[in-house]
Every structure is written in structure tokens, then in C-alpha cells.
């Protein structure tokens, strides 16, 4: 295992400045992860854009031991072995074992949300609670990011693209390494993951599903599919947020997620006919 004080390129003001970088050998991959904070472990699985830091993760690290894992195939080594999201999730489980975690909360974003759901199914005894941010397993009405013109990409991911000082397009080398994996596990698959749908009703882990009400990648109504299939699921729409909820509404995202992790159902109003529910 190797460690650095902060992630490369991070200043004291930039997201991720308080995270240290580590690597573990697991399943034939050298896997990088970033860690910050103390308390109960919160494992974070990134989206198709790879491991990135956000103010939301900085805020969560004030209350939890946050471990953001770069999934196999998103680092310097291509992943040519995994054919399904379930296989990728099993490899992530091996990484978590190598890190030495027993029980943990689990947060997955978009592509990582689909992986997190499969991981929770594979290791339900290890996952304390599950948070899925715009998860990509059910994508009715969605748009493949590869088909979005570059000039429209930021607006699909962020509600207020004008607030992003500089938008850097994806690195071509990174895309060449990772996109075949993304397409193989997600892009070329049906928009409805039937295999996952068949297993979710047996997953008793308490789950929070969040979508931005202006998501331009995966329409937020797909959150209702998760709520219908999962026995212990709550679905929340975050106002004035697009696909990247952490980027659009960092404080709101952190407030909802931290309350859910700490208090579970006690932080939510029960659904009633007299209340407006998603």
C-alpha cells in the first residue's frame, strides 16, 4: 500500500484536499482509493467519468470515514475481463476486503450506483445502508452520453453550467481505456436491468435513491422503479439539480445523505395519501 498526503493537484481550497491516496492489490488490479475522515465507513463508487472529488464528499468526511474507490478498469489498467456489472461489483468487494473493511455504508453514483446495487445484493450482510445517486440500472428515456454533442454535455449534467469556471472535456486516453468497459457493462445493455430487477425484492438493506429533478441524462421518474422493487427504499427528488447532484447542490445532498445514514427512516415522513410523495 502506498500513501500520499493529498491527492495530486489538490490545493487546500480544492475538493479532495483533505483526502489521502492509497493503493491495494486486488483481483489482479492495482486499485487506487482516496480516504478522509473518521467514524463509520462510507464507501463511494464513482460514475462513468471516473474517480472525482466534490465538495459533498468533503462535507461527508466531516462525519464519516469516506473511502472513494477507483473501480477496476478506471485507473491505468484497462479492464478486459468483466462482462457484467455483477462481476465488477464482486471485484469491488475484493477491493473492500483488501482494505480491511467489515461493515460499511455504500454510496454509488450513476454507473457506480448500478455497481453499488449489485454489490449490496452480493454482500447484504456487510452493507449497513445504501445510497444511490441517479443510479444507471434503469434508464427508460435516457440518453447515452456518447451520443450527446460535447457542447451540450455540461448542461445535461449540471443545472447551472455557468457556475462551472472551466469545463474540461474527457481525456481521450482515459476514454479509450474506460469506455469499452462502460459500453460492455451498461451502454450496450437494455435500459431495464431485468437480472437486477429480479433480485432487488430480496434486498432488505435500507436504501435511499436520489435524482435531480432536472436530470438530463437519466430521467428522474426512473427512481420510482427502484422504490417499487426495493422493500426498504425511499425515493427523493432534489430540487434544482441535474445528473450531478453533488456538483449542483452539495450542501443539500450532504444534508439528506448524512441524515439518512445517521437516522434512516426516522428522518423521513411516512408516505400517506394526504401527502405529496414522489
Q: What is each PLM-predicted segment?
A:
Residues 25-78:
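Conserved HGGG/HGGXW glycine-rich cap/lid loop of the alpha/beta-hydrolase fold
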Residues 26, 36, 67-107, 255:
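Active-site loop/oxyanion-hole signature of alpha/beta-hydrolase fold enzymes
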Residues 57, 205, 219-228:
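Short alpha-helix in the alpha/beta-hydrolase fold that links the catalytic acid
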Residues 114-122, 128-160:
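Flexible "cap/lid" loop of the alpha/beta hydrolase fold
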Residues 214-218, 243:
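Acidic catalytic loop of the alpha/beta-hydrolase fold
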Amino acid at each position: 500500500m502506498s500513501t500520499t498526503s493529498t491527492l495530486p493537484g489538490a490545493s487546500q481550497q480544492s475538493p479532495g484536499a483533505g483526502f489521502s491516496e492509497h493503493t491495494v492489490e486486488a483481483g489482479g488490479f492495482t486499485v487506487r482509493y482516496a480516504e478522509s475522515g473518521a467514524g463509520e465507513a462510507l464507501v463511494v463508487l464513482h460514475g462513468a467519468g471516473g474517480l472525482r472529488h466534490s465538495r459533498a464528499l468533503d462535507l461527508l468526511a466531516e462525519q464519516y470515514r469516506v473511502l472513494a474507490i477507483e473501480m477496476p478498469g478506471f485507473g491505468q489498467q484497462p479492464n478486459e475481463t468483466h462482462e457484467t456489472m455483477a462481476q465488477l461489483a464482486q471485484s469491488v468487494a475484493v477491493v473492500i476486503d483488501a482494505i480491511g473493511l467489515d461493515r460499511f455504508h455504500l454510496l454509488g453514483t450513476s454507473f457506480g450506483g448500478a455497481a453499488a446495487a449489485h454489490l449490496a445484493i452480493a454482500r447484504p450482510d456487510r452493507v449497513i445502508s445504501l445510497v444511490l445517486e441517479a443510479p444507471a440500472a434503469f434508464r427508460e428515456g435516457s440518453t447515452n452520453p456518447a451520443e450527446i454533442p460535447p457542447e451540450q454535455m455540461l448542461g445535461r449534467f449540471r443545472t447551472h453550467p455557468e457556475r462551472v469556471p472551466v469545463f474540461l472535456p474527457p481525456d481521450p486516453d482515459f476514454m479509450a481505456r474506460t469506455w469499452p468497459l462502460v459500453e460492455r457493462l451498461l451502454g450496450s445493455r437494455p435500459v431495464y436491468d431485468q437480472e437486477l430487477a429480479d433480485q432487488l425484492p430480496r434486498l432488505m438493506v435500507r436504501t435511499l435513491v436520489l435524482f435531480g429533478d432536472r436530470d438530463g441524462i437519466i430521467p428522474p421518474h426512473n427512481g420510482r422503479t427502484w422504490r417499487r422493487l426495493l422493500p426498504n427504499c425511499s425515493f427523493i427528488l432534489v430540487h434544482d439539480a441535474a445528473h450531478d447532484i453533488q456538483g449542483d447542490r452539495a450542501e443539500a445532498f450532504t444534508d439528506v445523505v448524512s441524515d439518512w445514514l445517521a437516522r434512516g427512516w426516522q428522518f423521513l415522513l411516512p408516505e400517506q395519501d394526504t401527502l405529496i410523495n414522489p
